[in-house]
Amino acid sequence: MESTECVRVAVNIRPLITPELLNGCTDCITVAPKEPQVHIGSHTFTYDFVYGNGGYPCSEIYNHCVAPLVDALFKGYNATVLAYGQTGSGKTYTMGTNYSGDCTNGGVIPNVMEDIFRRVETTKDSSELLIRVSFIEIFKEEVFDLLDSNSSALLKNDSGVQAKHTALSRAPIQIRETASGGITLAGVTEAEVKTKEEMGSFLARGSLSRATGSTNMNSQSSRSHAIFTITLEQKKIAGGSCTTTEDGGEDILCAKLHLVDLAGSERAKRTGADGMRLKEGIHINKGLLALGNVISALGDEKKRKEGGHVPYRDSKLTRLLQDSLGGNSKTVMIACVSPADTNAEETLNTLKYANRARNIQNKAVINRDPATAQMQRMRSQIEQLQTELLFYRGDSGAFDELQILKHKISLLEASNRELHNELQERRVASEHFSKRAYDAQVEKDKLIMIIESVRNGKSLDEIESCQNEDVGLVNKYVSKIQELEGELLHIKNLKKTSNHQYSDDSYDVGPRSNNVLFPSSNESSDCEDKVMDVTDELEFQEKEIEHCSLQEKLDMELKELDKRLEEKEAEMKRFSSGGTSVLKQHYEKKVYDLEQEKRALQREIEGLRHNLASIPSGPGDGAQKLKEEYVQKLNTLETQVSVLKKKQDAQAQLMRQKQKSDDAAIKLQDEIHRIKSQKVQLQQKIKQESEQFRAWKASREKEVMQLKKEGRRNEYEMHKLMALNQKQKLVLQRKTEEASQVTKRLKELLDNRKASSRETLSGANGPGTQALMQAIEHEIEVTVRVHEVRSEYERQTEERARMAKEVARLREENELLKNAKISVHGDTMSPGARNSRIFALENMLATSSSTLVSMASQLSEAEERERVFGGRGRWNQVRTLGDAKSIMNYLFNLASTARCLARDKEADCREKDVLIRDLKEKIVKFSSYVRYMEIQKADLVHQVKAQTSAMKKLSADENLKNEHSMKKQETRNSTIVLEDMDTSDSEASDHEREDPDLDDEWKPEHESERESEQESVIKLNRKRNFKVGRRRSSVVMRRSYEENSETPSDDAVKSDVCCCTCSKSSSCKTMKCQCRATKGSCGPSCGCSSVKCSNRNADGKENNSISESEALENGENSQESDEKDKGQQQQVLASRGAMLLQNALADKPEEETNDDGGTRRRRKPLSDIGNTTGKSNVPRPSQRKKWKKTVLQLVPVGPPALPPTHTNTHLIPEANSVTVDSDTARMPENSDSGESNSIKLKLPRAMRSASSNGSNLLRERNADQNGSESGGNSGFVQSNSGRASGSRTSDEKENHTRRV
């Protein structure tokens, strides 16, 4: 029976594994709900079953896919389960090839073993089963036996790599092809198994011997294709539903189940394979490529109809799977895929191959024993030939009659089955009734014996005591009788069946002779052989008739013996039914009792006679009466003795009759034994005759089989020659067609050459060549595009893995923060920012996943296009030698141009490498120089600190010397204070901007002494200075007396040794300067300022710039130390203040750094902004006391600042320098020596006033009135009560402005 069906395909989607989840992989496969449909990107595939990821659960794979194959295996069909997919997709886990004896892991193979042996237990009564297993692997295109016990044991090291010497010790197995076209393995081990545990042990042993290894994608990757084969042979036992075939031969089925676990396809770049692993991967991919080509060839319906070539011989794997793919097998393919988007390309290729496999059609047939199958085919052929013969004889109604007979036969077979079932039921009922009849017979015999005992006068106690012995004897006789009856019935049935068989054989002579006398048209060429067959057949029939007559004669004798045996057994049964043995015992006991009673009575009579004789004969009445009593009693006893004698005689007569019956029974038993022995001898003779006839018949059948085999061989040769002839005809026809096509093509080419001869003369590049070149350009562009897409695919994969790690890290930080396991540091991201980052990364991951799937789809389509159009398909348009030369020249030009460009790029790269190397060397040098400068800076800072401490001591000595001169100067200045206080606000503002360094000449060490001298003046001018003080309260002074006393003045030292006596505000342009009058230059010992003085050399300016840079460095160092003590709120406030100041001023005022880290604005000389010079001889009032600190909140408003025309980047103030503290407000009085020339700037009056006042208009608004009017008790008190013209001078105003 042949059935055609397609290969069934199931897709198993495994879940994402831990490494894929860590890399941020997502599912790229979606399963349609309640449909076996899979979506990946823009592709949709439909299969028979889909498991995992929304489909059926994976545990249902066996029930849906493999269980029907096990049913087919027991029906005689070959079956195959094939697991296909990329490495790491779960093929070995699905198949269960890594079986270790534990069934909890599941898998196809363990379930198959359990199901097979469960079915074996249910069918062992009707069939004899023989199960064999084999386990092979295909490693490096060589077939090895995993169950070979002769080869050395395979040892594995810790990493799972097989040792080389053990791998070489195994001998490869050769593949052979049978005469019928099947594939066999020469020398493979086929172990016979009888239990599931035994089969599991072979599977586990082979799994341990299988080649495995570790790669980047799978720690235990299968490095070979494994095939576990289960061979099942079954023969029906007599009494089963299908015991024998119609000709009396046994029906033997032999089927195989192949369980294939393929090695996964892999890419060397992703697996990281090298060396031996790389070679193994090459062989694996080679075998899978051949398998894919076979699937493509079998799945293409057009090629299948045309009878195209299927490349089975390209690989040993495809040769072994030749029957499974397109052959005699029922096949299920399980495509194992990974849902990770990084594996989207391999997953798409696997799904495409699985979709093609659904189009493969297999033709599975029942695999019977060759001899039985041949007899079945011959019988079918005979029936067909008989039907055709009847049809060709002209009897058209015979065919219809045959169909009617076939229908009747089917009905009779159905009726036969029903009757057979009814017979089974009746047989069960008959056994039940026979058992009941047996019990009834035993009970009946028991009752008969009890009745006889009662009739014989036995008491109930005696009957019950003897009942057990009687029951055993009765059961023994009844069972013996039933056995004899069963044997007799069996002999009768055998006799009847033998008679029917002989009669059937005699009836079969006619049809056989008819079949011989009317050979079919197909055998007309072998008439002479058929005549010999007819004579042999007639001789065989005569011999068989003779044997049948002899058998009938022996059967008649056996029937007579059975009849006599029945009669004797019936008579024996009558004897046994009487219970003679029981009666004998009963009567013997009765006789013995009577004899005992007789002797007792005789003794009593003798005693009575003796007593009677001893009685005296006197006349007494007593003696007479006693004598009469004795006489009467004596008579009674004598009467009893006579009765007993009669009974004894009767019993003796019965005993004699019983002895006669016993002798008759013994004689009857002897006759029965003699008849049985004759029967046995006759049966042995019948059996011997049957054996002789069977041996003769077997020899004749063997000769017939040999002749038929030779006839089949001749017929096969004839068919082979006919097929060869037909094939040659087809080849000849194809060659003729090809020749005609080539001739036609040649004519077309000649016509094209004649038509294009003029074009080739005008130029080599014709339209056809241009089209070819464009096609080549297109192919190259496609290749480059594929390379770009693959590179981008790999880059996206790496980038996605990095983002996944970052998301995992951020989530872990969230969890730790929630659990309060870590503390929040300054550099830790806020929770909102972290959540936003996670959300953004997740969106990027989703976008990356869709991009990866799209690129994988493009790469898969490119590979498919390369497979279809690559090779010869790419050059189909090249039809002439000229086109080939043009294409080769064009390709040569492309290759040479690409090579030249590559060389140019290499040269550019080398130049860039040299440049990068030089830059790296410079970076190293500058880094070392920076470290050297930092060391020098630290040394200079240390020196400056030492010099500062020395200058403090020197300034203290100088202050003591100049105390007397300062008192006189203060007295002169106090007389002029009232005059200067009458000036207007604008004049005060101008005086404040006139000379920023006038207050530097004041010595803070003497302020405590000057306070007492100027008390009277301050009291007089308190009212007049109130308005001026309130207006100037915005300029916050936070400089303490103690801090001012620590800052020495370098100009004080210079004034003692000055050449000229010019003031610091003087520019030394007139002849009043002694240095200019003597035609000399001012020097560092002069009293004039280095910034204002125009009579100084460039060297001095350079020295001043050097000193200024040193001061800046010192200020930066101190500023860095101060910044560490300031809080976060001051930094924010300072940054906003800096923004406000930059928006308020067109040009940013230059600032200068003090030694202690404070900053102050550099003031421009009044001569540069158009104001008149203030009076140089104006007395300087005493400084204010320490001002109270106030908080200033600056709001950045106003238009954006204009870019400054010139700004020194190293003088830009820090953001935290706007809020001035008392610690940072100290300014050395010699800071004028480090100032550079200011840039001329014309500003409006209001802006000049704001800038000169330190831009503290907002502070003036928010300042505390009480804080601005008075300071601390230890500081110098400056009155703000009014505008007294004599209380404050322009120098004082300027000093206050500078300190802000």
Swiss-Prot record:
Keywords: ATP-binding, Cell wall biogenesis/degradation, Coiled coil, Microtubule, Motor protein, Nucleotide-binding. Residues 580-615, 653-697, 781-823 form a coiled coil. It comes from the Eukaryota. ATP binds at residues 85-92. The keyword ATP-binding applies. Residues 956-971, 1001-1013, 1289-1300 have a biased composition (Basic and acidic residues). One of its GO terms (cellular component) is microtubule. Residues 1169-1180, 1205-1222, 1230-1239, 1275-1288 have a biased composition (Polar residues). One of its GO terms (molecular function) is ATP binding. Disulfide bonds: none annotated. Residues 956-1018, 1097-1132, 1144-1187, 1200-1300 are annotated as: Disordered. Disruption phenotype: No visible phenotype. Composed of an N-terminal domain which is responsible for the motor activity of kinesin (it hydrolyzes ATP and binds microtubule) and a central to C-terminal alpha-helical coiled coil domain that mediates the heavy chain dimerization. Kinesin-like motor protein involved in the control of the oriented deposition of cellulose microfibrils. Homodimer. This is Kinesin-like protein KIN-4C. The gene is KIN4C.
